[in-house]
């Protein structure tokens, strides 16, 4: 009888945990609420119990809470698409993940702004346990986006040239660094600003070969022959002139639309240079890429560059869950440093 009671007691054990939840779509600082909930502290057969360690606030997270992102979790939902955590316990059927592993989400909308979470095994992916917090928490989105765009559209060789706008974005900075590692030259377009000289130095320190303003791009005074690949996250006039830099058979890949303007394409290069236009969304790559080997290969190479210091850490600002309104407001208005929730 005592054994039966002990087993029943164990099965009914629960853990209290805090998480950032939204119940409707609106301005993130107003939509997000800090809630304490109770979850089982023992995973079922196919589940994994994760202690989340750190999670960034990304533009996609903000768009999701605003209701304008393609992926919409069922409401109420926990915020956060990216982050990393440590596996506390695993269910009896779990085979690809073990206790002590560091894991990241394997799908969008998982909800990483929480202290503890019970997740299905196939919703998580193990990563290198030795990566520091700044690398591990942002390992899923920006570095792989840069990596895949450089690998999947044009067969780039050492000495080739890549041009990009939004070069000071997180993806743009990873493009610069990966190109430097691979021996590929970069032409980097940024907006004019008061601290332009400081920004140019920062990007050149990362390995940028050329840094020009959008106005310099539009003037066409500078020539950049042999551009094989162009990466566009702005759209509008910027994409028009960026595509004009492409050599014969070149490709412009669009992965964002910061200007909220349609992507423009120059007629002459499209006809006479046979340039192509493609789109890229990292979430879709994860959805259709069912081979764990290809992902392991990418993660291993990126982790190696991070641990060697060839890819530098992002500057971050650490926030507690209870300071969520301020953190979200800052993430909406300032873009120089990545806002993080530290969850341990």
Swiss-Prot record:
Catalytic residue list: 69
Binding site for NADP(+): 142, 168-171, 191-193, 255-258, 280-282, 338
MF GO annotations: enoyl-[acyl-carrier-protein] reductase (NADPH) activity
Subcellular localization: Mitochondrion
Coiled coil feature spans: none
Keyword Nucleotidyltransferase set for record: no
Primary localization class, coarse: mitochondrion
InterPro entries (alphabetical): ADH-like_C, ADH-like_N, GroES-like_sf, Mito_Enoyl-ACP_Reductase, NAD(P)-bd_dom_sf, PKS_ER
GO biological process: fatty acid biosynthetic process; fatty acid metabolic process
Keyword Lipid biosynthesis found: yes
Swiss-Prot/TrEMBL keywords: Fatty acid biosynthesis, Fatty acid metabolism, Lipid biosynthesis, Lipid metabolism, Mitochondrion, NADP, Oxidoreductase, Transit peptide
Residues of the transit peptide: 1-14
Reaction(s) catalysed (UniProt annotation): a 2,3-saturated acyl-[ACP] + NADP(+) = a (2E)-enoyl-[ACP] + NADPH + H(+)
EC number(s) per entry: 1.3.1.104
GO cellular component: mitochondrion
Family the UniProt entry places it in: Belongs to the zinc-containing alcohol dehydrogenase family. Quinone oxidoreductase subfamily.
Quaternary assembly: Homodimer.
Primary role: Catalyzes the NADPH-dependent reduction of trans-2-enoyl thioesters in mitochondrial fatty acid synthesis (fatty acid synthesis type II). Fatty acid chain elongation in mitochondria uses acyl carrier protein (ACP) as an acyl group carrier, but the enzyme accepts both ACP and CoA thioesters as substrates in vitro. May provide the octanoyl chain used for lipoic acid biosynthesis, regulating protein lipoylation and mitochondrial respiratory activity. Involved in iron homeostasis; affecting Fe-S cluster assembly and ceramide metabolism.
Protein name: Enoyl-[acyl-carrier-protein] reductase, mitochondrial
């Amino acid at each position: 009888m005592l054994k039966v009671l002990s087993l029943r007691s164990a099965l009914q054990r629960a853990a209290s945990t805090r998480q950032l939840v939204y119940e409707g779509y609106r301005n993130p600082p107003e939509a997000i609420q800090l809630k304490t909930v109770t979850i089982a502290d023992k995973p079922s057969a196919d589940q994994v119990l994760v202690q989340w360690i750190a999670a960034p606030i990304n533009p996609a997270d903000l768009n999701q809470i605003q209701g304008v992102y393609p992926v919409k979790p069922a409401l109420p939902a926990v915020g956060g698409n990216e982050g990393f955590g440590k596996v506390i316990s695993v269910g009896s059927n779990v085979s690809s993940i073990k206790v002590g592993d560091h894991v990241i989400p394997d799908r969008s909308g998982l909800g990483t702004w929480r202290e503890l979470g019970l997740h299905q095994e196939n919703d998580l992916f193990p990563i290198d346990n030795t990566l520091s917090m700044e690398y591990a928490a942002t390992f899923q989105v920006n570095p792989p986006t840069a990596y895949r765009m450089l690998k999947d559209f044009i067969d780039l060789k050492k000495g080739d040239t890549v041009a990009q706008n939004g070069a000071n974005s997180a993806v743009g900075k990873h493009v610069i660094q990966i190109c430097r590692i691979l021996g590929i030259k970069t032409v980097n377009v940024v907006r004019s600003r008061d601290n332009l000289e400081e920004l140019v130095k920062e990007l050149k320190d990362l390995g940028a070969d050329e840094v020009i303003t959008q106005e310099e791009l539009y003037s066409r005074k500078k020539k950049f022959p042999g551009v094989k690949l162009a990466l566009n996250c702005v759209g509008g006039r910027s994409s028009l002139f960026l595509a004009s830099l492409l050599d014969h058979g070149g490709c412009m890949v669009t992965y964002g639309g910061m200007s909220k303007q349609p992507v423009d394409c120059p007629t002459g290069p499209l006809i006479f240079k046979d340039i192509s236009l493609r789109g890229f969304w990292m979430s879709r790559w994860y959805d259709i890429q069912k081979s764990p080997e290809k992902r392991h290969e990418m993660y291993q190479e990126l982790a190696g560059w991070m641990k060697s210091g060839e890819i530098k850490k992002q500057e971050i600002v650490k926030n507690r869950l209870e300071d969520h309104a301020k953190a979200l407001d800052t993430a909406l208005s300032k873009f120089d440093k990545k806002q993080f929730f530290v969850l341990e």
